């Protein structure tokens, strides 16, 4: 009976939290970044808790979205989910607001493999490999400043979002939401490969500091 009650509570809370945790929420506790992996070819999208929270192991993810901003000729292969299951669910090429850009959104489907948060550490969400001939930039959308942010000419909802609940902290259920992006030059800590339960320091990607975009050029 206790199991049934807990399951019902989880489902109902996730439904209500999904409504609350939408792209563009201005206050939150979770930060995203994108960088190259150790092979210098694959790109990874990571989440990290900010300094205000200390997540327990009893978290549950209810919603999520990651939107990449690339050149309009961008293509990729080998999308691999590492924390949660992610699928491409929208793409817009050359909108009038940013005709040189493409906006590719990846939606969260299920918390399998589970997204495991740890204080001051990165968790890898998914990876992908850009086409060999692509030499443009790849960055995460800035929800509040991008020219294609909602409302836009396509009536779409690009943006970054992650909504989680923590059942294991004192004081009752805690809610964590996406806050902003962070970039290289910060102390990112070790990465957590959620599906493999291993920790490995990630190499530094080359970023355009003023834009937070990852370059495909190899480090010199």
Which residues fall in each region the model found?
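Bacterial N-terminal signal peptides that target proteins for export
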Residues: 1-8
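A structural detector for beta-sheet-dominated domains
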Residues: 33-37, 46-48, 69-71, 107-109, ...
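Structured beta-strand segments within beta-sheet-rich domains
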Residues: 46-47, 89-137
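The transition from N-terminal targeting/processing segments to the mature protein
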Residues: 47, 57-59, 79-99, 117, ...
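Ser/Thr/Pro-rich, low-complexity mucin-like regions
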Residues: 117-173
């Amino acid at each position: 009976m206790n199991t049934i009650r807990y399951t019902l509570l989880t489902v109902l809370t996730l439904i209500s939290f999904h409504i609350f945790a939408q792209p563009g929420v201005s206050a939150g506790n979770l930060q995203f970044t994108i960088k190259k992996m150790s092979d210098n070819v694959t790109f990874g999208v990571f989440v990290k808790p900010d300094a205000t929270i200390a997540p327990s192991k009893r978290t549950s993810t209810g919603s999520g979205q990651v939107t990449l901003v690339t050149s309009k000729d961008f293509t990729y292969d080998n999308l691999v989910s590492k924390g949660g299951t992610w699928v491409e669910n929208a793409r817009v090429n050359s909108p009038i607001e940013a005709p040189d850009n493409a906006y590719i959104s990846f939606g969260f489907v299920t918390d399998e493999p589970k997204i495991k948060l740890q204080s001051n550490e990165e968790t890898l969400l998914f990876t992908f490999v850009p086409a060999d001939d692509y030499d443009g930039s790849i960055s995460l959308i800035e929800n509040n400043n991008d020219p294609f942010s909602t409302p836009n000419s396509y009536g779409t909802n690009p943006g970054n979002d992650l909504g989680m609940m923590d059942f294991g902290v004192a004081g009752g259920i805690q809610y964590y939401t996406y806050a902003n992006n962070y970039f290289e030059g910060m102390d990112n800590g070790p990465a957590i490969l959620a599906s493999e339960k291993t920790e490995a320091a990630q190499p530094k990607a080359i970023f355009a500091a003023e834009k937070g975009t990852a370059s495909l050029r190899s480090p010199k």
